[in-house]
């Protein structure tokens, strides 16, 4: 019986078809304007930008400008690059403008498509961020697409890793800014650690288009960006613990590859305890005693480093450093470090220099960073499989954009073998057959180790003319990938290495021009050579087409269908022919970890002989089912982690907003008085609570705490002996005494100086306590899961206790600020010595990776100038009024004023 949904779909079409139909109608409206825009001069076309901006000022909406704005960009692209965006690119541009994700096949022109909504939204003048996965793509796209924006009178900036603060600020001030997700996140964190608004570089989060959105918002969703500072050096202990692991046997530990965890068995725990005891590091006989918490952490990391992390698969050793390999792309991630001591454990394992651990100063995940944008959209070749996650987490709808030309790629059924050895024999055989007829081949592997194993097999078989593209040769990545479509080219690549670079049959013209003609200046010779390259590429393309187009051969299935689809999508761009096939074995990680027992028994019943493969659609469906299970599990993990991170994110917003208020404030006296009064009221409530008899009051403790906190001795014990005195009277006396004491201390300083002191005290105290709070939250997060054993919801427990920790932090903040305010001294201090603080930007995957990002200097500049009168008392600075910065200081020190009393910082006790 045919379901009603199928009947309805046949009658009315699917929701996607209806949406695309509506967008096509709008694309036709844009195309109808084309003839008019073709008649405009370059100046008139450029003038459209000012016209659109004026219309926005006059009350028109950005949506009403869309048809004309898109037509403007289309015409500009034709004039600048002789490239005309197709109607399907107009459709994709509208999806991006409407807060959606445009799923567009490889080679269909995502980069050009993005110029349409980028231009439209840049008209508002609030800044548009185009986000890419690496500096190369950010720089390339800013350079190429920037010419279109410049033609239309808009400015384009690019944020690269090595830019200084001023250059970053200038790039963010542009109408359009290209940057990587890492740089955007780190700049946000740095901005919220500055001491002055003028030191910030970003100007808000208005609209962002994320290229390769699945990579950033799905694959790296659990990746916190971390700003950290160094902790104490524990190199000797890492090396000691590292010597324990080789003495263990398989019965001493358990490995869960599915969950990626390692644990000691009871026998293993006893062995470790004995080794620690002999080394003099075990307290109270048990490894799991509360005093050995830090040791357990080190031992567990050492076990994980040795038994779970594989060299040349998860990381490589290069130039004496551990360099992490991205599990999704196979790329090196230089500068990134595993956090929480894991990276140090790997360094000890590989006997390279151990870098000190870092303390988190500020952090944010990509999930929470990109959800700050008022408007967010993305584009990729593969997003449909993750549509539910994009919708639930980010509120983004995935729209599959139709191709400009029909896809001609043939996706063949998988070939499955019993063993890895049989699989590789078949792969080499298939490569030889395709290679001999001149077909370009892209071989996809899942790790550096496997790509090099295959390369070695090919060499033994006499096939040597191939390129290996993996994390070891990252610098050549784009060029090698760009030429993978040349007839006879054989390229072995780890996963999605080279993503973002098109594989064009015959080779990439632009890449060849850049590579071959970089030293030849503009002129007739260069023009002639460019024409020759174009003719050569066309001939090579015809040969590649005749050989069947690009053949994508995958040596293994990934956990995610999306990654497999990305690899397939490298072939068959823009209607070109091509083919793809996956070669698998029952010993592959996916099959082995996620249950191939049933499949193995079926293959045995079928009487599968050695070197024989089974090819059947049922196998593909079974594999897809396994992948869906893994994807669903990973989605649940990400969703659950986000719930926990949202707790910290809410607190982070409060702290960062408070810092911004303080930096923007012209006078903080009222805030300081309020904090001071809150502290006093808390002390009163603690030691002489309302509604209690005076016999229950603890006057001695109150007097002691007032002395510590306010640097003020008050006769509280005598006051409480007075007949009929109430706690309210004591409160008023304390407030009066504290106010008088504070006024006497500050009357000699100008209002500007006091604002500076208040800001310095507040910001430094907030930052210090926030760092401690982050450590407390990390500790809480690491143990909260055990609450489940007591039949309590760990998430609710975490929310409750995190809130209590936050409340305690705010209480401590008030007390610390007041204490420092009441005890600071004004001392002479040269402006040049402004307390530098060493910090690192880090990038942590699954709360485990850090990214070293250079050294930042957090400096508090005192730009206030104290004035000086005609009659000046050297001992009384209040009589000096205005003093020139280069005049001698009135105090009689014979120093210039700017190097004496003209430069002050607060000296804080405690």
Swiss-Prot record:
Keywords: ATP-binding, Cell inner membrane, Cell membrane, Cytoplasm, Membrane, Metal-binding, Nucleotide-binding, Protein transport, Translocase, Translocation, Transport, Zinc. Pfam families: P-loop_SecA, SEC-C, SecA_DEAD, SecA_PP_bind, SecA_SW. It is an enzyme of class 7 (translocase). It comes from the Bacteria. It catalyses: ATP + H2O + cellular proteinSide 1 = ADP + phosphate + cellular proteinSide 2. ATP binds at residues 89, 107-111, 502. The keyword Transcription regulation does not apply. InterPro entries: Helicase_ATP-bd, Helicase_C-like, P-loop_NTPase, SEC_C_motif, SecA, SecA_DEAD, SecA_motor_DEAD, SecA_preprotein_X-link_dom. The keyword Metal-binding applies. May bind 1 zinc ion per subunit. It is found in: Cell inner membrane; Cytoplasm. It is a peripheral membrane protein. HAMAP family: SecA. Monomer and homodimer. Part of the essential Sec protein translocation apparatus which comprises SecA, SecYEG and auxiliary proteins SecDF-YajC and YidC. NCBIfam families: PRK12904.1, secA. Part of the Sec protein translocase complex. Interacts with the SecYEG preprotein conducting channel. Has a central role in coupling the hydrolysis of ATP to the transfer of proteins into and across the cell membrane, serving both as a receptor for the preprotein-SecB complex and as an ATP-driven molecular motor driving the stepwise translocation of polypeptide chains across the membrane. Belongs to the SecA family. This is Protein translocase subunit SecA. It comes from Bartonella bacilliformis (strain ATCC 35685 / KC583 / Herrer 020/F12,63).
